[in-house]
């Protein structure tokens, strides 16, 4: 796993708690600090493989009776993890870089968009940190484009993008020494 003890700790802790990946702890920390996902939220998880963020998102929706939904999108076919997820979680296999906003919006509850968009998309890592960070940035920009539309709108009622007005957007990026 990682070279340091911290990575090994989170890997083992994820296994112990039933998370499919240690990345679940990143979203747990964000959720604990900022409460971005509430009961009834509609969540879009871009780059959802292997499913750790799907698990945390579903948990954060609270009891099943509170409603809400989670849609995961990834180029890989992702099975909904059996632990920490229920029928509110669905996944599709699609390439986010070519997926039209209209298709994503059509997959949202009542076709009105999502209240939370999460992006944990990661490029195929080459090991060249500057290149990997640049590719990660491109994926982050695609998430931003899907969320808000291809240009900044002055009127929030324009309906461009799949993020609802007042919604939350989380984008995880790789970094390099050059990009800091």
Question: Whereabouts are the PLM-identified features?
Answer:
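Class I SAM-dependent methyltransferase Rossmann-like catalytic core
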Residues: 1-42, 58
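Conserved Class I SAM-dependent methyltransferase catalytic core
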Residues: 129, 133-180
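Glycine-centered, small-residue-biased loops immediately flanking beta-strands
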Residues: 41, 65-68, 167
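Class I SAM-dependent methyltransferase "Motif I" SAM/SAH-binding loop
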Residues: 47-51, 174
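A generic alpha-to-beta junction signature in SAM-dependent methyltransferases
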Residues: 37, 61-65, 111, 150-157, ...
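Conserved beta-strand positions in the Rossmann-like core of class I SAM-dependent methyltransferases
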Residues: 44, 71
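S-adenosyl-L-methionine
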Residues: 73-124
């Amino acid at each position: 796993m990682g070279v340091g003890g911290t990575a090994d700790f989170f890997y083992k802790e994820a296994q112990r708690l039933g998370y499919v990946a240690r990345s679940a702890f990143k979203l747990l920390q964000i959720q604990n600090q900022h409460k971005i996902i509430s009961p009834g939220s509609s969540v879009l998880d871009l780059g959802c493989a292997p499913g750790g963020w799907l698990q945390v998102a579903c948990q954060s929706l609270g009891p099943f009776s509170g409603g809400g939904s989670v849609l995961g999108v990834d180029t890989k076919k992702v099975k909904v993890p059996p632990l920490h997820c229920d029928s509110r979680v669905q996944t599709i296999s699609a390439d986010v870089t070519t997926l039209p906003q209209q298709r994503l919006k059509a997959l949202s509850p009542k076709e009105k968009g999502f209240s939370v968009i999460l992006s944990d998309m990661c490029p195929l890592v080459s090991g060249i940190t500057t290149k990997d960070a640049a590719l990660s940035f491109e994926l982050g920009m695609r998430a931003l484009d899907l969320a808000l539309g291809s240009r900044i709108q002055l009127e929030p009622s324009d309906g461009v993008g799949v993020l609802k007005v007042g919604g939350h957007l989380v984008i995880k990026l790789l970094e390099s020494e050059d990009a800091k």
